[in-house]
Amino acid sequence: MASGVEVLRFQLPGHEAATLRNMNQLRAEERFCDVTIVADSLKFRGHKVILAACSPFLRDQFLLNPSSELQVSLMHSARIVADLLLSCYTGALEFAVRDIVNYLTAASYLQMEHVVEKCRNALSQFIEPKIGLKEDGVSEASLVSSISATKSLLPPARTPKPAPKPPPPPPLPPPLLRPVKLEFPLDEDLELKAEEEDEDEDEDVSDICIVKVESALEVAHRLKPPGGLGGGLGIGGSVGGHLGELAQSSVPPSTVAPPQGVVKACYSLSEDAEGEGLLLIPGGRASVGATSGLVEAAAVAMAARGAGGSLGAGGSRGPLPGGFSGGNPLKNIKCTKCPEVFQGVEKLVFHMRAQHFIFMCPRCGKQFNHSSNLNRHMNVHRGVKSHSCGICGKCFTQKSTLHDHLNLHSGARPYRCSYCDVRFAHKPAIRRHLKEQHGKTTAENVLEASVAEINVLIR
């Protein structure tokens, strides 16, 4: 642009408000309306661009469903939905105080954060009312009647002490946050939890393939961290600390280690995803006592996990099978899954892998019944996110987590509690609900649903 060109700039005051008024007038006359929102008996004709700009939920719905009619399932009256949709055009919302929780929940469902924030601020006035209300001429009876509408939903409000400045409103109590919090959890926070809970739902095919055999000395040298044996196997303070302790208390260097070896195994279901694990088997010798102790410690750790011990984040170790304390690696040990007895923990570990199909994660010590579960678990440690959302572009490690994430875009809640008929968009959410509220498992929930269906058919 030439430097001598003069530019005129006009700011049109009130343009946004005038445009919305004109759009609302066109909506009332049903002109240029390109979508109909259906909720029970309500049929709201409007414009996609206006509704999508005010509600990310509706925006995602329009992207997934390009038709001219959209069904919205809300557990509220059609009047509440109509008021919220109309506020997209008018910028105003008016309702009775007793309905504030219903409007807050419905606005949270539609992801209308500006309405949610206003409802929270208004609700905080009833949680801790200010003393100045009575001094301004508001009678005590009217104040009590205003608070009684929400008394059944709120905890008892504490009496504030007189002060020149009223205290800031407290955060919203848990009972009011629960509907919002349960429906929109963070996907990345649930990813590792969902991976752990879904590990037993894959196919029963075992596809282990041994690709390399190394001696115990080679493996110990490759896995040994710079600071010593305390962080063995890359487990960092949890399993690694226990392996380091066992390695230090192992046989002296002059002692000849028992026959043993280490197999590095590769587990994979596809070319672009694979996992690694360690398997101890008889055969081969290690000439260094510390190396022998490390391998024995890994075997003890695997045996402890097989006996019900925990080598996860808690770092606790369960009792070893057959009362094995780690002092004598050649002591007879009984398998916890069958009546067989073995001399030496390394033979027990080999037996458990060969006969009982137990796979172990070399990063955290978690054990799996199938290599596919280990393969999927290892992707979490690697940070591999090969499943992406086609709507917002967010990536996930697990395919099941992506499916749950898509439920937020579509508004679907496919997971239903058979005990209280509450629905959830995320599988980990219903698992947590069943455990905390009913003390049940997912299998018991499915069984309860089947029993209820049978009862309906019989009647």
Curated annotation (Swiss-Prot):
Per the record, residues carrying Phosphothreonine are 19
Name where it's found: Nucleus
An example of a Gene Ontology BP annotation on this entry? regulation of immune system process
The segments annotated as C2H2-type zinc fingers are: 333-356, 359-381, 387-409, 415-438
Per its UniProt record, what SMART domains does this chain match? BTB (SM00225), ZnF_C2H2 (SM00355)
One GO MF term, please? Answer: zinc ion binding
For this UniProt record, the keywords arranged alphabetically read as follows: DNA-binding, Metal-binding, Nucleus, Phosphoprotein, Repeat, Transcription, Transcription regulation, Zinc, Zinc-finger
Primary localization class, coarse: nucleus
| One Pfam family it belongs to | zf-C2H2
What are the GO cellular component annotations? nucleoplasm
Q: Known PANTHER family for this protein? A: AGAP004733-PA (PTHR46105), ZINC FINGER AND BTB DOMAIN CONTAINING 12 (PTHR46105:SF29)
**Protein name stated in the entry:** Zinc finger and BTB domain-containing protein 12
Gene of this entry: ZBTB12
